[in-house]
Amino acid sequence: MRISKYKQVASAIFYLSILFNSQIASATVTLPLRTKKAMVVSANPLGSEAGLEMLRKKGNAVDAAVATTFAISVVEPFSAGIGGGGFLLMHSAQTGEMKALDFRERAPLKATKNMYLDAQGKVRPNVSINGYLAVATPGTVAGLYELHRRYGKLPWQEVVKPAIALANNGFILSQQPTWRSLPVYEQRKQAILANPAARAIFTRNGEFYQPGERLIQRDLGKTLTAIAKNPQDFYTGNIARAIASDMAKNNGLITLEDLKSYKPIWRTPVCGNFRSSKICSMPPPSSGGVHLLQILNIIGDTDLKSLGWHHPDALHLMTEAMKIAYADRSVYLGDPDFVKVPVQQLISPAYAKIRRGQITMDRAKPSIEVKPGEIGRGGE
């Protein structure tokens, strides 16, 4: 199998991994769905169907999650893909065990502190968002394989199969916000058009595929087929060599050494209590779990329900609590592999009480006035 087979998809994988950080939110409010058996939820019905297929084949939740994620990388490539990474939280109903898997992207070994600054020390516009310097060493394939290796039930090839079919046979573009909005945002549109591999995949002679048309990604199908046979091919085999070659030709930083040394990390979930419930979430380097608990602690015993839907006082309290969490995030949150993060102080009820006392219910404080709290810096 020649390296050249993967060059186009390698280029597209990493170019698309830095596009479309956000999605257009829907204002539609629907009632929650419930089931007594199992449920798969994702950003696209085709992704959810891939997960359901695993459950129908007597697979478990891990099989469904892995199949869904691979399928999403085909049908929603601008929001998730094998060129990216992720965080995963897993709960075992049988044992009560909570596990957190960190398979986020890692900075390449050649990355430097000032790589996004010019000679005058000013930020280089869009360099950290678009292009090869914006890309970090991907973790999705390694993370999904690690998860499946430990907890999956069906064969690895089986869980990758739906994604391969979607890539090889194509799928009809839906009215999902991703595809509907793609040709509209000029900056994103031009970024794709400027990349030969992305242009060849997502346009027909420079015109973007429209909802209702079929998109086929055969090169991605070949890559996924290789991953199904041996996921390590992505990090040490032909796919890795194609990625490293493409990076070198386009002033990117990822090397074979970066890919070879990548390993996902199992971490301990961050947990706390909110009223009668135990809340667990992703720990650092994710900031979400710590600050979710911090926000809930600040809200405390305030009866938001009695205030009514969208009551100004309820919205005000939640907004001010979020401002406080984000102010703390700017100073205290980071990657625990490199810095000490004061998790326990940030999520402590005593600290939340102090911060709650800084909220004035009759005045919205501008974000610039909300300062980080005074806690022990540099450790727990």
Named regions from a protein language model:
Residues A27-E49, E53, A61-K229, F234-T236, ...:
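Noncatalytic scaffold domains of N-terminal-nucleophile
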Residues R149-L154, P231-D233, I299-S306, R329-L333:
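Short helix-capping/linker segments at secondary-structure and domain boundaries
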Residues T302-E380:
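Internal maturation/activation junctions in enzymes
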